[in-house]
Amino acid sequence: MVEADRPGKLFIGGLNTETNEKALEAVFGKYGRIVEVLLMKDRETNKSRGFAFVTFESPADAKDAARDMNGKSLDGKAIKVEQATKPSFESGRRGLPPPPRSRGPPRGLRGGRGGSGGTRGPPSRGGHMDDGGYSMNFTMSSSRGPLPVKRGPPPRSGGPPPKRSAPSGPVRSSSGLGGRAPVSRGRDGYGGPPRREPLPSRRDVYLSPRDDGYSTKDSYSSREYPSSRDTRDYAPPPRDYTYRDYGHSSSRDDYPSRGYSDRDGYGRDRDYSDHPSGGSYRDSYESYGNSRSAPPTRGPPPSYGGSSRYDDYSSSRDGYGGSRDSYSSSRSDLYSSGRDRVGRQERGLPPSMERGYPPPRDSYSSSSRGAPRGGGRGGSRSDRGGGRSRY
């Protein structure tokens, strides 16, 4: 990195502190015309620091002087004479490191950004809905209050997707569950339509997220592992909640309609599983009164809900049409009408509505709440579904 200073400039080191510019000029002047003699002095004492720079007009003269004078004695001291080099701070070396540094941090930042983007990415992969779901959840959570924090960040990333998801949800409902979708709409209409609608939209989002459920789940788990865990504890309730509320309530219908077609029922189930695993949903649900009350019962289900439910879901998903279908249909239908309202209301959106629909809710809540999730659900499902067991 050392660069030679301008040609003709010599560094003279090891000088006697008594040697001055005139002496240097006298000694080196015999090699050629000297342009400058710079004796380095201490700022405070103004004494020679023992080295100087002599600049010759001709580089050739400088070379001769360096060759002849290097190691010679001047004023009793052997001096060192060589081509002057630029100080390291002037060489540009100093400049270079900063660029790397500046670059480095940006890289890190970029990486960080990329990472964050990546995290977002997966969810979006899962589906915008996932994000949407998150946002919805978050939204819901926010309505709940505590949950929002956990989900807060995701919502941002998910924020945009939610919008998409909501639309997608409706689309799904229109396509797959045209009938149901309308139903959900009706439900929405029914209790505090405005309130519900927001929920429904969220649900839609949820649905979509659930569809994306996997991704949601993944994203959730990855994103909100902690929350998922927390939610897991919660999860059970939320799940129930989800099932009940969502599944049963119009949301389920909505889900079914939306999530349904998209999920193929699969999504829905998965949504549920997602919820369980996601936990955020659970949390959200948890926030809901029902899930809260139910949590204890559901406590066990969480794990069960997560795995078995998943399985159930899977099976039901596969046989989703059949068992779940009936389940969902019975549930959704029963739920949709009663639970729908109840579920929505239960969610705590329209408490008044909730109260209005106590009966469905009771049955619904009793099934979900009273029994552990698995049991309750199974029971409720069978009740709802008729003989159909959960599966």
Swiss-Prot record:
Regions of compositional bias (Polar residues) in chain numbering: 216-225
InterPro entries attached to this UniProt entry: Nucleotide-bd_a/b_plait_sf, RBD_domain_sf, RBM, RBM1CTR, RRM_dom, RRM_dom_euk
Gene3D superfamilies: 3.30.70.330
Residue positions where N-acetylvaline is found in the record: V2
Sequence positions bearing N6-acetyllysine: K30
Biased composition (Pro residues): 151-164
Keyword set, alphabetical order: Acetylation, Activator, Glycoprotein, Isopeptide bond, Methylation, mRNA processing, mRNA splicing, Nucleus, Phosphoprotein, Repressor, Ribonucleoprotein, RNA-binding, Spliceosome, Transcription, Tumor suppressor, Ubl conjugation
Expression sites (tissue/organ): Both isoforms are widely expressed.
Sequence positions bearing N-acetylmethionine: M1
PTM annotation: O-glycosylated.
Record cross-link Glycyl lysine isopeptide (Lys-Gly) (interchain with G-Cter in SUMO2), residues: K22, K80, K86
Composition-biased stretches (Basic and acidic residues): 62-80, 194-215, 241-274, 338-347, 380-391
Principal localisation: nucleus
Region of interest called Disordered, as start-end residue ranges on this chain: 62-391
Keyword Repressor: yes
Residues carrying Omega-N-methylarginine: R125, R144, R164, R172
Binding partners and assembly: Homomultimer. Found in the supraspliceosome complex. Identified in the spliceosome C complex. Interacts with KHDRBS3. Forms a complex with ILF2, ILF3, YLPM1, KHDRBS1, NCOA5 and PPP1CA Interacts with CLK2, KHDRBS2, SAFB, TRA2B and YTHDC1. Interacts with ERAP1; the interaction is RNA-independent. Interacts with SAFB/SAFB1. Interacts with PPIA/CYPA.
Biological function: RNA-binding protein that plays several role in the regulation of pre- and post-transcriptional processes. Implicated in tissue-specific regulation of gene transcription and alternative splicing of several pre-mRNAs. Binds to and stimulates transcription from the tumor suppressor TXNIP gene promoter; may thus be involved in tumor suppression. When associated with SAFB, binds to and stimulates transcription from the SREBF1 promoter. Associates with nascent mRNAs transcribed by RNA polymerase II. Component of the supraspliceosome complex that regulates pre-mRNA alternative splice site selection.
Protein name: RNA-binding motif protein, X chromosome
Organism, as annotated: Mus musculus (Mouse)
